[in-house]
Amino acid sequence: MELLSALSLDDLAVAFSKLPVFPLFDVAYYIISILYLKYEPGAVDLSKRSPVASWLCAMLYCFGSYILADVLLGESPIHYFSNNANILLASAVWYLTFFCPLNIFYKIVSFLPLKLVLVGMKEVVRVRKIAMGIHHAHHHYHHGWVIMVLIGWVKGSGVALMSNLEQLLRGVWKPETNEILHMSFPTKASLYGAILFTLQQAHWLPISKAYLIFFFTLFMAICKIYMTATHSHGSPFAIFESGICCVLFGAANGDHDDHGDHHHHHDDHDVSHSTVKSKEELNEGTRKRKTKKAE
């Protein structure tokens, strides 16, 4: 904290943490979220065939994190839909993205320089949602660290954790795409961010919430902008995760491969052994036939 104070970032961090996200940053969040929905196979056909189903999918993309968090906390899952301004903004973005004449709106927001700006703005909303989720869970469960992490993670992950439900609305069923089994970078980052904010809320992390919001938003924005610009699907955490998992949980894949190789070599040995045995039996039979002919 003394180092951060020496950098004179106090005012900047506090001002950034108090920066309102509505409507500018929220609109950016809706644009990028619904843009990703349009990238999904069959999403455009669905919007023409069943606009209601397409709109519901768009609302899940925009507000799925609130719905799932409310369900986990025992609150009404449709509570957030009482925010008329947000619903109208998200609906307007959905309509323009799918039904704007000549696809003008889609082409504008897909323009890479503008898209990178919108991606960075979306991460501002994501981190703010994680922080608010931790605060909300702490209000209900003061010492429930796991609950705080879970709610913060859900708030930050958005619709990713509800991807199977969203796919059902589109008439698609892909259980192998379960986000928990194959976490994307935003889902992993939201989990790690939720852990950091929970530690800060419990006063185990010696940093103010304003600083944590500022630096974690900076990290998320830089990573997502870089990944979007380079069309990368890798994770910056991959190197650390592989090392930590190897130490804590062992090289599961390597052991499995070694086990498989052992069986493979054993099978090869059995096959070669049986082949040699068959050749020996064949030669023995040939010798017996020759002996009979000679007799």
From Swiss-Prot:
Residues 33-51, 106-144, 200-201, 255-295 are cytoplasmic. Its main location: membrane. Ca(2+) binds at G74. GO terms for cellular component: nuclear membrane; sarcoplasmic reticulum membrane. Residues 259-286 have a biased composition (Basic and acidic residues). It is a multi-pass membrane protein. Residues 1-11, 73-84, 166-178, 223-233 are lumenal. One of its GO terms (biological process) is regulation of release of sequestered calcium ion into cytosol. A 1,2-diacyl-sn-glycero-3-phospho-(1D-myo-inositol-4,5-bisphosphate) binds at K122, R126. Channel activity is activated by a change of voltage within the sarcoplasmic reticulum lumen and blocked by luminal high Ca(2+) levels. It comes from the Eukaryota. Coiled coil: none annotated. Keywords: Calcium, Ion channel, Ion transport, Membrane, Metal-binding, Nucleus, Potassium, Potassium channel, Potassium transport, Sarcoplasmic reticulum, Transmembrane, Transmembrane helix, Transport. Residues 259-295 are annotated as: Disordered. It is found in: Sarcoplasmic reticulum membrane; Nucleus membrane. It catalyses: K(+)(in) = K(+)(out). Intracellular monovalent cation channel required for maintenance of rapid intracellular calcium release. Acts as a potassium counter-ion channel that functions in synchronization with calcium release from intracellular stores. Opened by a change of voltage within the sarcoplasmic reticulum lumen. Homotrimer; conformation seems to be controled by binding to diacylglycerol (DAG). This is Trimeric intracellular cation channel type A. The lineage of its organism: Eukaryota, Metazoa, Chordata, Craniata, Vertebrata. The gene is tmem38a.
